[in-house]
């Protein structure tokens, strides 16, 4: 459901997604669904991203578009500034320059209120958007694959953050949630 950015941040979010310049509606919908499943408070689509109400995006979200906070944002720089002012740490998903995700977790970075900044499917985040983040973080690739699909990388990052938030809140870090 559409919400203003101020309403999202006014509710003290712990986990937020910023989709910057995401163009593929299937990936965007899958990111929405993954964010919802990981317990994120909202997903922000930058002004240069695909329309989240594109029919392919809605289908790929499998209904999550209707029950996660959805912000139709403006310029990424303004969005990042607003989120930082609301107390969120902004992490840029970047496999080229980022510290490995498995090194960020033990430092406690992921347990803080976090906004994940994800870029375009084809070329990731440009340098000007990378510079907006508090730090770049990448999903390590142990095999021969060149990279991960946007939705796959988002899933790894969001679930790792969700686990860190649960552990930080005193929850059982190893508990398996009940399935539906």
Q: Which residues make up each language-model segment?
A:
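Active-site/ligand-binding-proximal alpha/beta "capping" segment
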Residues: 91-145
């Amino acid at each position: 459901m559409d919400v203003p950015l101020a309403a999202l941040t006014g509710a003290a979010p712990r986990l937020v997604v910023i989709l910057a310049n995401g163009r593929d509606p299937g990936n965007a919908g899958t990111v929405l669904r993954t964010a919802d499943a990981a317990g994120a408070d909202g997903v922000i689509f930058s002004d240069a991203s695909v329309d989240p109400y594109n029919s392919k995006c809605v289908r790929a979200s499998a209904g999550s578009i209707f029950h996660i906070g959805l912000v139709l944002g403006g310029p990424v720089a303004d969005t990042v500034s607003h989120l930082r002012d609301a107390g969120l740490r902004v992490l840029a998903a970047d496999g080229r320059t980022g510290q490995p995700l498995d090194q960020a977790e033990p430092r406690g970075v992921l347990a803080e209120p976090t906004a994940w900044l994800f870029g375009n499917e084809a070329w990731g985040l440009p340098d000007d958007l990378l510079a907006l983040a508090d730090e770049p973080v990448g999903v390590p690739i142990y095999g021969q694959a060149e990279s991960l699909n946007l939705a796959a990388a988002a899933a790894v990052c969001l679930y790792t953050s969700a686990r860190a938030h649960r552990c930080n809140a005193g929850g059982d870090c190893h508990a398996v949630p009940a399935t539906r």
